[in-house]
Amino acid sequence: MATYNGSRYVAQQLTSILDQLDEDDEVVVVDDASSDDTRDIVAACGDHRVQLHRLPVNRGYAAAFEAALERASGEHVVLSDQDDLWPQERLVAMQRALGTASVVVGNVAVLGTDAPLRGPFGQREWRLPEDPSHRVRILAGLALSNVPYFGSAMAFRSDFLPVLLPYPASARELPDAWIAINGLVRGTIAHLEQDVVLHRLHGANATGTIRSPRAVLRGRLLFVQMLREALRRRGSGRGSS
């Protein structure tokens, strides 16, 4: 988990995570130089499984998450935002899927309604394709920002970390897509039908924000760069997945 000025909701999120963990599991939290009391709240939870790391200066969301991945030591790496909630049985379902896949992604529901997210092109229900084997089609949808691959709904095996790290420059704006692209090009990604995140909508994270044409164009350029790098890493035999 990467945190930044998340004092309002981070304690609730930590509780929803810790309730599903075993005693020898860990929660790696990297705080990106918050200016509020987020770090104090995390430290005050008093659970030995929570490992808090403080960045001395604000480096941005992707860099903080990369720092958290570098510190992860468990067999399975399960990602989390600071202000959502984990529904019950999330961890069990994702660990089961990781028995045969390197990366697993689930769906996202809106907290308080259990309704699915609305899509960027007017879809009333924005959900993952049931079959992730249609990789070219899914990659094309991802290039158009029309596949709901959220990092907070992802998990992967620890042997996938060498595939992802270090992040290329192109992934520092779209780290969620970077994970998905690598899972797709290697054919090792699984989709869960169930909701694995209860997403909290508030002013600081409003889903569905309209992007400018320039931002859309830049996103597609970054996608191409990430895809090329993922293919290069696969060709070089990087990682064991």
Language-model features, listed with the residues they occupy:
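Nucleotide-sugar donor-binding/catalytic module of glycosyltransferases
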Residues: 1-211
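C-terminal, non-catalytic tails of nucleotide-sugar-dependent glycosyltransferases
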Residues: 215-241
